[in-house]
C-alpha cells in the first residue's frame, strides 16, 4: 500500500490539524492518527507476525489503526466481520489457516494451526491492500485478494463524480464491507475526513455531519440505509451527494429523493466486491430500471444468452480484484465471469438478477429482479422478492413476498403486472410479510426469507 501510505504521510505533514476520522462522537486529526498508528506499530513489532493478520474488532477506530499499522509492517490485513457468528469465524480461520488474529482483547496467535497463505503464495499478488470476504449470502464467505492499483483506479473515476467542495466522505457500514473500507481509504488518500459509525443510526449520522460546520459530505450508502435516512432527512445542507451501491435502487426511493432532497447529487453505482465499479447512473439520467452506463475503463460482454438475449455478465477492467484465495490470479486483461445476468440496450446496462435467483417455470427462465423492480413501483408495495418453490406440474412456481401497509390479493398483483410482463412471469402466489430480513451488507436475505416461508414462520 505504498501510494496510499505516502499520501497519508503527505496529508499529515501538510494539514496535521485537519480531521481525518470522525467515528461516532470521536474526532481524530491526521497528526493524531499518525501517532496512534505509530504506537500500534511499536506494540505489534513485539510479536513474530505471519504474512497475513486477521482483524476482528468491534471498534472501527481500532480496526482502522490496526489496518494501517499492519501495512507499515508490510503485513496483509484480512478484514473479518465482527457480527458473524463465532462458528463462522472459527470455520474461516481453520479454512484459510490464519495464525494471527487481532481482536478486541489483543492479538491471538494460533500456533498449532497449519498456515494456508504463506509468503511464497503472496509473491504472486504484489502490492496487496487486504484480503476481503464476499457477503456469503448463500454459504460460507469466500476470501479474495484486493490490490492497491485496482482501488487507485477506482478512486480516479470516483473523483470525476465528486463535487469540488466535498471535503468529507461518510460510510456508516462495517469496515469489513468493501464499500465502507473503500470509502475510508478514498477519504484518507484524498485528504478528506472519513465519517463512520460503529452501528448505523440515521439520526446520529446526520448529527455527526452537522457537528463540524465546514463539512460538505458525500455519503456512500446501500439502498436500505438511504431509505432509513430519508425518514429523518430535512433539508440537510451539509449533505451534497448520495453514492448508492450494493443493490438496485427502487423507483420508490428515487421518488422520495426527488421530493425530499432534490438538490442532492445522486450517483447509483453497480459493482461487486470482486469487480469494484462497473456502471453508474448520475442524477437519474439513465432509465430508472437500468444501472446506468459503463465506466470508461470497463469492458463488458454477455455470454450464454437465452432466447430473450439475456446473458451472463463478464467484465474486464483495471479495477478488478486479484482473484480468490486458493484460486488462480485474475489479470486486468482477462474476462471475469460474474454471477449476474443482464443485457445492454442503447448503451445502458440492465440487470435481470443473480444466476442463483433465476427460476425455471414450465421450461421458461424467470428473472425475479426484473419483476420485483416493477412491483416496487406500486404505492402499495414497499419491498418485494419472488422466491421459487417446487411444483410437480411446472417444476417451480413463483411466490411473491412483499411488505407494505396494504394487503393485496393475487388479482391486484396480476392486474398491476399483466401489461408489463409475460403471463408466466406473474407470481402464482402472494404472501404479505411484516418485515424483510437483511444480510449484513443491507441486501434482502433471500435464502433466509425462503426458509422462513417454507417453515411457515412469515
Swiss-Prot record:
Q: Which CDD domains does the UniProt entry name for this protein?
A: AFD_YhfT-like
Q: Which residues form a coiled coil?
A: none
Query: Which Gene Ontology molecular function entries are recorded, alphabetically?
Result: medium-chain fatty acid-CoA ligase activity
Q: Which GO terms describe its biological process?
A: fatty acid metabolic process
Give any Pfam family that matches. AMP-binding_C
Q: Which family does it belong to?
A: Belongs to the ATP-dependent AMP-binding enzyme family.
Could you identify this protein by its name?
A: Putative long chain fatty acid-CoA ligase VraA
Q: Where does this protein come from, organism-wise? A: Staphylococcus aureus (strain Mu50 / ATCC 700699)
Amino acid at each position: 500500500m505504498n501510494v496510499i501510505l505516502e499520501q497519508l504521510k503527505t496529508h499529515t505533514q501538510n494539514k496535521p490539524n485537519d480531521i481525518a476520522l470522525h467515528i461516532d462522537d470521536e474526532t481524530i486529526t491526521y497528526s493524531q492518527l499518525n501517532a496512534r498508528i505509530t504506537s500500534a506499530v511499536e506494540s505489534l513489532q513485539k510479536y513474530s507476525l505471519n504474512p497475513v493478520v486477521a482483524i476482528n474488532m468491534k471498534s472501527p477506530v481500532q480496526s482502522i489503526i490496526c489496518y494501517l499499522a499492519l501495512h507499515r509492517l508490510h503485513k496483509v490485513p484480512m478484514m473479518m466481520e465482527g457480527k458473524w457468528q463465532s462458528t463462522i469465524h472459527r470455520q474461516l480461520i481453520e479454512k484459510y489457516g490464519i495464525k494471527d488474529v487481532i481482536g478486541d482483547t489483543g492479538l491471538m496467535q494460533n500456533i498449532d494451526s497449519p498456515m494456508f497463505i504463506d509468503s511464497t503464495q503472496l509473491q504472486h499478488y504484489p502490492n496487496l491492500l487486504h484480503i476481503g470476504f464476499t457477503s456469503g449470502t448463500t454459504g460460507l464467505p469466500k476470501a479474495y485478494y484486493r490490490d492497491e492499483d485496482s482501488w487507485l483506479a477506482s478512486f480516479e473515476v470516483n473523483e470525476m463524480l465528486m463535487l469540488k467542495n466535498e471535503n468529507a466522505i461518510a460510510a456508516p457500514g462495517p469496515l469489513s464491507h468493501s464499500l465502507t473500507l473503500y470509502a475510508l481509504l478514498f477519504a484518507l488518500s484524498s485528504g478528506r475526513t472519513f465519517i463512520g459509525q460503529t452501528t448505523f443510526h440515521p439520526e446520529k449520522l446526520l448529527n455527526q455531519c452537522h457537528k463540524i460546520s465546514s463539512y460538505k459530505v458525500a455519503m456512500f450508502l446501500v439502498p436500505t440505509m438511504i431509505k432509513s435516512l430519508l425518514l429523518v432527512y430535512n433539508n440537510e445542507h451539509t449533505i451534497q451527494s448520495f453514492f448508492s451501491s450494493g443493490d438496485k435502487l427502487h423507483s420508490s426511493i428515487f421518488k422520495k429523493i426527488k421530493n425530499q432532497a432534490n438538490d442532492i447529487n445522486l450517483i447509483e453505482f453497480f459493482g461487486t466486491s470482486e469487480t469494484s465499479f462497473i456502471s453508474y447512473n448520475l442524477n437519474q439520467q439513465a432509465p430508472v430500471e437500468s444501472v446506468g452506463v459503463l465506466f470508461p475503463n470497463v469492458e463488458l460482454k454477455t455470454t450464454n444468452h437465452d432466447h430473450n438475449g439475456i446473458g451472463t455478465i463478464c467484465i474486464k477492467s483495471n479495477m478488478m480484484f486479484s482473484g480468490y484465495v486458493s484460486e488462480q490470479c485474475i489479470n486486468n486483461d482477462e474476462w471475469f465471469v460474474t454471477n449476474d445476468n443482464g443485457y445492454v440496450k442503447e448503451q445502458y446496462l440492465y440487470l435481470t438478477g443473480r444466476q442463483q435467483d433465476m427460476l425455471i417455470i414450465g421450461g421458461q427462465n424467470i428473472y425475479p429482479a426484473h419483476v420485483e423492480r416493477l412491483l416496487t413501483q406500486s404505492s402499495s408495495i414497499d419491498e418485494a422478492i419472488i422466491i421459487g418453490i417446487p411444483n410437480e406440474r411446472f417444476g417451480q412456481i413463483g411466490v411473491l413476498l412483499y411488505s407494505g401497509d396494504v394487503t393485496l390479493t393475487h388479482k391486484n398483483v396480476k392486474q398491476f403486472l399483466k401489461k408489463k410482463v409475460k403471463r408466466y412471469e406473474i407470481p402464482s402466489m402472494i404472501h404479505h410479510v411484516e418485515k424483510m430480513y437483511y444480510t449484513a451488507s443491507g441486501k434482502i436475505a433471500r435464502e433466509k426469507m425462503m426458509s422462513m416461508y417454507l417453515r411457515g414462520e412469515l
